[in-house]
C-alpha cells in the first residue's frame, strides 16, 4: 500500500493525480501547514527534509521516497505495469517536459505563491506598498506562465 504524506498547498497533489491515473491503491495521511505556512514537525519524522510530497510504500519494506519527480518515476517503475512510460519516439519530449516543469515552471509558481502570501505577513501599514509591488510581480509571473515555453 502506498501512503501519501499529503501537506495542504504542496506538490503532493500531483502524486495523487498519478496514483489515480495509474489506478494504484493508496491512503492519505493529512498534514496541515502552521500559521507560519510551514510544514509540521511530524513530516520530519517521515523524512528528514520534513516536506511534502513523500510516500511510504508498505509493500516494499516501508520504503520512503521524497521529491515529486522521484516519486512519479518510482510509481511508474514499480506499479505502472507499462503505463506512464514514454515510447522511444517520445522520450525526448518526456525529458523536456519533466525538466521544464521542475526548472522553469515551478520557480515561477513558487514566486507567485510567495507574492500572494507576503502581504499577509507584514505589518498593516506596509501592506498597500507590498500589494502594489506584488500585483506588478504577479502580472509579470502570470504572463511568463502563459508564454513559456516560447
Where are these regions (language model features)?
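GST-like domain detector, emphasizing the conserved glutathione-binding G-site
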Residues: 1-128
Amino acid at each position: 500500500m502506498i501512503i501519501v504524506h499529503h501537506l495542504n498547498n504542496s506538490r503532493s497533489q500531483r502524486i495523487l493525480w498519478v496514483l489515480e491515473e495509474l489506478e494504484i491503491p493508496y491512503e492519505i495521511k493529512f498534514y496541515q501547514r502552521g500559521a507560519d505556512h510551514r510544514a509540521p514537525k511530524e513530516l520530519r519524522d517521515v523524512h528528514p527534509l520534513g516536506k511534502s510530497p513523500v510516500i511510504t510504500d508498505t509493500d516494499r519494506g516501508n520504503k520512503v521516497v521524497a521529491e515529486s519527480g522521484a516519486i512519479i518515476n518510482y510509481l511508474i517503475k514499480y506499479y505502472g505495469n507499462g503505463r506512464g512510460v514514454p515510447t522511444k519516439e517520445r522520450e525526448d519530449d518526456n525529458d523536456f517536459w519533466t525538466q521544464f516543469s521542475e526548472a522553469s515552471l515551478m520557480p515561477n509558481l513558487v514566486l507567485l505563491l510567495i507574492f500572494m502570501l507576503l502581504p499577509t505577513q507584514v505589518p498593516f501599514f506596509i501592506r498597500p506598498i507590498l500589494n502594489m509591488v506584488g500585483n506588478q510581480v504577479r502580472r509579470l509571473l502570470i504572463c511568463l506562465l502563459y508564454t513559456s515555453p516560447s
